[in-house]
Amino acid sequence: MRTTYIAKPGEVERKWYVVDATDVPLGRLSSAVASILRGKNKPTFTPNVDTGDYVIVINAEKVALTGRKASNKVYYHHSNHPGGLKARTAGDYREKDPEKLLALSVKGMLPKGTLGRQQAKKLHVYRGADHKHEAQQPEVLDINKLI
């Protein structure tokens, strides 16, 4: 009888991937990136161990928002002071802070808790085509083949 393989945190091998977000719908990109961050693309996936890889997303400012999401999708946060509810649309985020728009979208698709926060730290988002992780020799990943 065979036993199920359970990954241990010390023996996980991690890769670096580069994903180009140009004209890719935000939700489809986020779900594919979240899957890689969790490690669900590996045969050694274990739900309670961080088996995921590092992901670098470039050209975040060129991500596609389909339909009327640029004006109708609203992100809320509160400053914990009376009357401190802040609201920004997805279009505002795409113009002013596209890195945060993509990070919020991916973070919402990761587990809630310490493991999800640990996995979210492996995401690196950049506005343009340049990034500072060339030393890690990242592998280019075509996101259209994953969706």
Curated annotation (Swiss-Prot):
Cross-referenced PROSITE patterns: RIBOSOMAL_L13
Example GO BP: negative regulation of translation
Protein name, UniProt field: Large ribosomal subunit protein uL13
Function: This protein is one of the early assembly proteins of the 50S ribosomal subunit, although it is not seen to bind rRNA by itself. It is important during the early stages of 50S assembly.
Gene name of the record: rplM
GO CC terms, sorted: cytosolic large ribosomal subunit
Subunit: Part of the 50S ribosomal subunit.
Entry keywords, A to Z: Ribonucleoprotein, Ribosomal protein
Single GO molecular function: structural constituent of ribosome
Family: Belongs to the universal ribosomal protein uL13 family.
Keyword Ribonucleoprotein assigned: yes
